[in-house]
Amino acid sequence: MMQYLFGGEYPLFSNIKMEMGNDGNNSTGAEACTKRYEDEEADASRSPGFVMAADAKKINPNVKVSILRWEYPNWVKAKADGTEKYAAIYKWYKETIFDAYEKYGYVVDYIDPDKNETGSPDGGIIKYFANALENETDFPRHFTGEAKEAYHNIKIVASDENKGLKIVPLMRSDSGVYDAVDAIGFHYRTNATDDYIKMADVDDKEVWYSEGCATFGYSELQENKTTEYGAGTIGGYQSPLALLDSLPNAFVGSRRTMYMFQPAIGSFYEGIQYGHKELLSARDPWSGYIHYDPVLYMLSHITKFAKTGWENDTNTNGIWRVLPNATYGSFGSSDNEHQTAGINGDASYMTLAAPDKTNFSTVFINNTQNEKTFAIKTSDLNLSVDALHIWTTVTDDYLKQGEDVKIEDGIAYVTVPAYSVVTATTLDTTPERFPTEDGSGDYIQTEKRTVLDTDYTGKNQNTTDDYLYADNFEYTNEEDVTVYNATTGKETTENYLVSRGNEPRYMLDTHGAWIVENGQLKQENDSSVNQWNGGDPATIVGDWRWMTAPPLT
């Protein structure tokens, strides 16, 4: 799974964004707090995101890591507003980053210190963090000189507003905020003011779609739609094609060059509080079942045919650029994240090219009922080929190579079917398929989705006895876990329970925190915390198919 997501010559993804949890609920349950009390040592292993990032860096060391928060732990909440609270939030972040480096050997790349989806960006905390990161001297002994430099170079993201457009005006009015912010991130809209585009084109700031929708349910079920727009296809309203179409429109309307999915991977129990919508489902660790949504193939039409990622300071990393004059948005961008061009509207296209002009790819997204034909004029390029390779996705036929299209008199004509994605590229490459058992990648799930049903020990599958699940919370016979260190490039082993921050197996917390202590399940927090979505504390274990089991007495 990780190799498919982060591996290959042209990786599908190059960034991992994770939440600094406070044991309160976000969209998908409670994210564990790495530092629940001011006087305890931070423990990054409580958060699976830090572990996942290390595993991703084993595959691709260039993967970037960004973190942000919804709220904060109660010991931070108790501090006075202003500098005292800024210092407490910074301490929480800093000590977590220090611990993550000690355990996994990397320093995060980006921080948004402000509250996620704030309605009023806090210039004070943005400036406080930028200054503190740059001037930090109190490093632990395990921090190398290279790690210290990486820490001083952590970049600031602001301000992850939900549709709001307040951060750029704040940057224009406050030079300290302007200097502090490296990346401008906002959510759930493709357009912005002209000043956001200027921030990218003139001021050389990064502009991100820092939270956007993933798919709306399993994409292969889209063909069951009966509405006229997109009936029987992967297109239409709130469809996989509509999702993909937001990328070129967001570039045209606000110069976004990063799209972050909420969530990219779903590993929380179905029905927990929020309808699951993800690119990849891996929520049954006892079965090994993984569902690869077909929209991953649609995204591959972009990232598998270009060198994506971050350019270095000397502009020698060879990262491809999006060409504004060869990119078009079908609906011209909107403050409605579900906007489409309509059943008889335009198609979008986006062109990425190598800095030396030797290669390029154009991606066409046609979320309409009409076939389109485009002429690609290959002027001002240094091409060594006389034809373009064509890759197409239509309903139930994903990322398939077609016949090459000749470039004649500097022009290539590309036909784009209704409700499809087509990539025309100079690259002679074959994208990876889903890692299915037969190697074809033509179906979308791995092993059979085994139900969670154990014997009285909790260690063996048994659907014939009277037990559904058992756990003694000791884990003494569990094998040690392999942990990768991105600095040394080596793997070590760690105690099973310690490696997971003393969190119980298969249990998902909501509105609180539960840990394993001395072979017992313990509720950790004795008071509620600020959270996005309130409710009573619970920890949940199970399988939705237990609904068919007879009542227990």
Q: Across the structure, where does each feature detected by a protein language model lie?
A:
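Short carbohydrate-recognition loop motifs
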Residues: 509-541
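Extracellular carbohydrate-recognition regions
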Residues: 434-510
